[in-house]
């Protein structure tokens, strides 16, 4: 399909993933709910106000939870090369005001799809807003991660699995960019950092002597007491049982 001008559509994504690619670039923007973009062995979580630029001929898939809505922008190759790909970030976010305005315009676009004049006016406005957002976001070069935000997210979700994709969404970065910046700043990988957070909490709970080790393992997000014991021993050189006895 040849695209000569940018085109927009509003979609609700289902839970299934179907990989595909096309000869034109795309920008996908979260409007409501939560969606996930899988691209080149990475996953990107798209919450409302978060967007991602997909280059032409790149294999990708979309999926979403219930009540999600995304705005899809198909781009002609010449616009992509001159007006979009000059910006380094594939992953970007909108400020609250711009997100609200784009959401309202997307609703109008969906409800009045048969009005060609209105649709063209809305499309032009959307194109300008998204281009401006890409420019503003690219100017905000991320040099250091906000570890307070990341730590807060980790602490609130320690009882479950925490993926790099989730943490990168908190930092408003693409997964690969977040991983490299995190390792450079902290000296360890995100996975190792989360594991240490789990084990730090485990030590604290064991010291309080109010919960059995099986419950400690569960509260700290380990799939089994065995995996908890192995991780604890690797980091601290003794088993949780031994540590429990040692601090009495």
Curated annotation (Swiss-Prot):
Probable transcriptional regulator. Its target gene(s) is not yet known. This is Probable transcriptional regulator LumQ. The keyword ATP-binding does not apply. GO terms for molecular function: DNA-binding transcription factor activity; sequence-specific DNA binding. Disulfide bonds: none annotated. Keywords: DNA-binding, Transcription, Transcription regulation. Pfam families: Cupin_2, HTH_18. The keyword Transcription applies. CDD domains: cupin_YobQ-like_N (cd07003). It comes from Photobacterium leiognathi. It comes from the Bacteria. Residues 148-246 form the HTH araC/xylS-type domain. The gene is lumQ. Residues 165-186, 213-236 bind DNA.
